[in-house]
Amino acid sequence: MRLRKITLREIHLRLLSPFQTSFGTSDLRRILLVEADVDGVSAWGECTAGENPFYSYETVETAWLILRDYAWPMLKGREIAAASDVWDLLAPIRGHNMAKAAIETAFWDAEAKQKNLPLAKLLGGTRDQIPCGVSIGIQPTITGLVAKVEEALAAGYQRIKIKIKLGLDVEPVRALRKRFPSIRLMVDANSAYRLEDAALLKALDAYYLIMIEQPLGWDDIYSHAKLQSQLETPICLDECIHDVEHARAAIETRACRIINIKLGRVGGHASARRIHDLCQANAIPVWCGGMLESGIGRAHNIAMSSLANFSLPGDVSASRRYWAEDIIQPEVEVTRQGTIRVPTAPGIGYAPRLDRIESLTQRCEVLE
């Protein structure tokens, strides 16, 4: 495969409702799309970096620079045997996994299209449907939170995740468990706590959560190991895991019992598969986290989630949960049973709506 050209586009997509976490509120997503021309095949990837360096040090601006000034010169015109090689070819760039993933995942889309295979099959996926959960941001009232959960359950979602932060943790969990005693419920702290808050987090053991996601520092595997030894509830690591070696360290130190895999955070499909395989060998279940992706990023998540050890419902939701109108056709839909069908068309299995993308584009740069 030879990369002939890439087109970088920044689009703006407005969320149907604001999404609040422990580090801020989003109502508009700045999304960086990569369209790659690989041997004449048009292939797509998405960068999940945000506008601000709060979830990660990466932003839309840093990713644009890395893709334009470093990734493109490294890859252009080079003979590349397989998409799985791109991760290693970009290894001289330290970090910047979200930028790398944007171009790396496009290569996977291209290879799948060239081989006339669904991306899920090229990756080694075994599922024809994936179980879906939903992520609900911090709500201003408990009543509002309960209403959001009722809405998600009515739509068929199999697992409910709520965002928490210091002062908005035990009370909302208690209220939800009282109202919904048997639902699969988890919380996500996005690093809002410190090890000194262990007693507060231990209080959540009483509510039979399936996991507490990333309670402590975004790069602190050691403290998570100390915390996990005090909790009955499994810890799931998110922000701490950037590659297979971070996953290995977390497993060997018993810092978690579950790992969240996000394509952007780990640098693309090849890295995600390595983490998946390591976790599978160590009986650590994984699931796919979400970053408020457009349909292109969501399509890549669906393909990845078809791998065997993605055994817990992920954050891959319907397009209409977040966007009035997505940028792919057909849009992602969730069945009444709370699953998404893995597409069987070649590549990511969804067609980018070029007219819609063009209308949303704020800036564009063609590199050839």
Which ranges hold each PLM region?
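Flexible C-terminal active-site loop/helix
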Residues: 2-15, 26, 31, 39, ...
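Shared catalytic-loop signature of beta/alpha-barrel
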Residues: 71, 208, 219-236, 241-339
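Glycine-rich, aromatic-flanked loop segments that form ligand/cofactor-binding clefts
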Residues: 94, 104-136
